[in-house]
Curated annotation (Swiss-Prot):
This is Small ribosomal subunit protein eS1. Coiled coil: none annotated. GO terms for molecular function: structural constituent of ribosome. The gene is rps3ae. One of its GO terms (cellular component) is ribonucleoprotein complex. Pfam families: Ribosomal_S3Ae. GO terms for biological process: translation. It comes from Methanococcus maripaludis (strain C7 / ATCC BAA-1331). The keyword Ribonucleoprotein applies. Keywords: Ribonucleoprotein, Ribosomal protein. It comes from the Archaea. SMART domains: Ribosomal_S3Ae. InterPro entries: Ribosomal_eS1, Ribosomal_eS1_arc, Ribosomal_eS1_CS. Belongs to the eukaryotic ribosomal protein eS1 family.
Length: 224
């Protein structure tokens, strides 16, 4: 019996701890977003990092507390050493914040617009206008048409990085508010979501020369 126990113990396989063999990689934003480290991720093979999505709040990226409700998404597109480069693929706004902005006796006007920037990036932009008082249907239609035109015009006239900055930091929302309030009293404008549908051509200074690169034709969809 003692021999059997000894043989059983000797033949037992020890599970390999794959976690200890993983390497940690720093994820960097594009240079147009400051080229900052926004997180770390582990991997056994650097090729498996390509396509991973990293999330960070706009508050953490810019140190502006008022941007706490905005989440940005970056997709890893290259790896060199222990550094991973990324591309901006979209943003969204927390549901709790959007719900908190809606009040009784106000109208909510949504617009969903597909646009292309001056340097060839295609995005889907979702904007929201809240009126100061309840609006009639024809006012809603007029405001929506105006919103869509402003978004398309700004995208067409600016490069991708500049357009994204306008979306996130308030430039686009301010333009919509300023023009549409002449048509009807407004309370607030939010560019609450965006999604990169196609990448154009942009020159970035990578952290190091990329050893592993991913195609740039497709973008991952951000979560609702």
């Amino acid at each position: 019996m003692a021999r059997m126990k000894a043989r059983s113990a000797k033949g037992k396989r020890v599970a390999k701890d794959t976690w200890k063999s993983k390497v940690w990689y720093d994820i960097y934003t594009p240079q147009s977003f400051g080229g900052d480290v926004i997180g770390q991720t582990p991997a056994n093979d650097p090729a498996t990092l390509i396509g991973r999505i990293s999330e960070i709040s706009l508050r953490d990226l810019t140190n502006e507390h008022s941007k706490h409700m905005t989440r940005m998404y970056f997709k890893v597109d290259g790896v060199s050493g222990n550094n991973a480069t990324s591309q901006f693929v979209g943003h969204d706004t927390t549901r709790e914040y959007l719900k908190s902005q809606v009040r009784r006796r106000r109208s909510k006007i949504n617009a969903i617009v597909d646009v292309r920037t001056k340097d060839g990036f295609k995005l889907r932009v979702k904007a929201l206008v809240l009126t100061a008082v309840r609006a009639r249907d024809h006012h809603k239609t007029e405001i929506r048409v105006k919103m869509e035109q402003i978004i398309k015009d700004m995208a067409k006239e600016t490069a991708f990085a500049e357009f994204v900055h306008a979306m996130l930091m308030g430039g686009l929302g301010s333009k919509i508010y300023g023009d549409c309030k002449k048509m009807f009293p407004l309370k607030r404008v939010e560019i609450f979501k965006s999604e990169v549908l196609e990448f154009g051509k942009v020159v970035e200074a990578p952290v190091e020369e990329a050893a592993v690169e991913a195609p740039v034709e497709e973008a991952a969809e951000t979560q609702e």
